[in-house]
Design a protein with these regions (language model features):
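C-terminal structural segment of proteins
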Residues: 1-241
Length: 242
C-alpha cells in the first residue's frame, strides 16, 4: 500500500547499498519504504521441486540453506562482503540493485532462478536472466517490487562457481563465474554459464554454451568452448581490472 501511494519510492530492507548512496555518493533519496520487517518476505523454504526465497531473506540465512546444495556455492556465499553485510543485506536487495558485479545474480542465473514480482497489476513471474535489461536498468515498472525468488531443484553434479576479488573476503567481485552443466551419455545436454563483471549486466555466455551443447566433455570440447567464450563479452579495462 505504501508503494502504491509512492510508486517512485526507494525500497530498502538491509540498506547496505542504499546507505552508501547517501553517505558516500551524497545522493538525495526522497521517499524510502522499509520492507525488512515484513514476515512474508523473510521466509525461505525448500521442497522437492524448488527453493522459495523471500526477497527480504538475509544473505546469511540464504547461505545456511543454499550453501548446502554445493561446496562451491557455500564458498562463494561465505565471501559475500563481511559478516556485517551478510547479517543485514538481503537477497532481493542484491538482485534489485542491478549491479553487474553483484555476487548473487550470476550464481542464481546459472541455477535458472525465477523472480516473483508484485505490484499494482497482476503478479508476474520473470526469469532472472531477463530482469537485467542494460546497465542500470531492470525490468521493474513503477510500483512493482520483487517479492520472492524461486530456484528449481536440480542435479548439481556439473555445477561450479568461483569469485575473483582483490581481497579474499570483505570485497566486491572483479569477476564471478557460475557454470551449470548437465551430462547425458558423457555429452553435454544442458549448459548454463553466467558471468558477473564481464559486461554492464550479469550475462550468460551464449557462444560458450553453444560450443558445449551436444559435445563430448573432453579437452577438445573445452578448447572450443574457451575460444567461443572470448566472443561472448567485451569487458571494460577499468579500475576493477576485469
Amino acid at each position: 500500500q505504501a508503494l502504491q501511494r509512492q510508486p517512485a519510492a526507494t525500497l530498502v530492507a538491509g540498506a547496505t547499498d542504499v546507505g552508501l548512496w547517501i553517505t558516500k555518493h551524497t545522493r538525495a533519496v526522497a521517499d524510502i519504504v522499509h520492507i525488512g520487517d515484513i514476515d512474508a518476505l523473510k521466509q525461505i523454504h525448500n521442497n522437492d521441486t524448488a527453493l522459495h526465497i523471500g526477497a527480504a531473506v538475509l544473505l546469511a540465512d540464504l547461505a545456511d540453506v543454499l550453501g548446502t546444495w554445493s561446496p562451491d556455492i557455500a564458498r562463494v556465499l561465505s565471501r559475500f562482503g563481511g559478516v556485517q553485510v551478510r547479517s543485514r543485506g538481503t537477497v532481493g536487495g542484491n538482485i534489485a540493485n542491478g549491479s553487474p558485479i553483484g555476487d548473487l545474480a550470476p550464481l542464481l542465473i546459472a541455477l535458472n532462478a525465477q523472480l516473483s514480482i508484485s505490484g499494482p497489476s497482476d503478479p508476474r513471474t520473470l526469469a532472472l536472466e531477463n530482469f537485467f535489461l542494460r546497465y542500470g536498468e531492470q525490468d521493474l515498472q513503477a510500483g512493482e517490487f520483487i517479492d520472492s525468488i524461486l530456484v528449481p531443484a536440480c542435479d548439481l553434479d556439473g555445477f561450479s562457481c568461483w569469485k575473483v576479488s582483490k581481497r579474499f573476503d570483505q570485497d566486491i567481485s572483479a569477476v564471478l563465474g557460475a557454470f551449470n552443466l548437465v551430462f547425458e551419455d558423457e555429452s553435454v545436454r544442458e549448459a548454463r554459464i553466467c558471468f558477473g563483471g564481464m559486461a554492464g549486466l550479469p550475462q550468460r555466455a551464449s557462444a560458450c554454451e553453444s560450443a558445449l551443447l551436444g559435445q563430448p566433455f573432453n579437452r577438445d570440447t573445452l578448447a572450443a568452448a574457451k575460444i567461443a567464450l572470448a566472443t561472448d563479452f567485451e569487458p571494460l579495462s577499468d579500475m576493477r581490472a576485469t
